[in-house]
Amino acid sequence: MCDWIVYVIENKGYTYVGVSPDPVRRLRQHNGEICGGAKYTTSKGPGWKHVCLIGGFDDKIQSMQLEWAIKHVPPRSAGGLMNRLRKMVTALSRDRWTSKAPLAESVPLHIEWHQQHDFGEYVLPDHVTETFIQEAALRPSV
């Protein structure tokens, strides 16, 4: 059984939300180090970094439901990292991420922050916990 992760990445003011069982490998794909990155991210060039990883899903479908919900919080045209993070908190605070998703409170999630953020005061639902990772600990050993 593999754990599916929803991730938020950022590069030069652009953001992207995706799902992967291996977000480190997926980030390498987005940065063009190995093949398979999304067209959107490869067109923006290398330099993508994880902002946060969200885990705790029971299966791939649940992670994809949250990914969809984050991408569809209105207004969809509002870009930038701060707006993306606000949309993420909004999606996490819903009773259900989609009409067919389980009750959000039945899926205990954990956010692992990889970048400092300052998008104002926010309140996560009780079923969501968070930790902050030191940047030095993020670098993969060679």
Which residues are covered by each model-predicted region?
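GIY-YIG-like beta-to-alpha core
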Residues: 4-40, 56-73
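Short amphipathic alpha-helical leader/targeting segments
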Residues: 32, 44, 77-78
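Glycine-rich phosphate/pyrophosphate-binding loop shared by adenosine-nucleotide-utilizing enzymes
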Residues: 4, 48-49
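Short, flexible turn/loop "capping" segments at secondary-structure junctions
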Residues: 40-47
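Boundary/linker segments flanking structured domains
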Residues: 1-2, 64-67, 71-142
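Solvent-exposed beta-strand motifs enriched in subsets of small alpha/beta binding domains
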Residues: 49-56
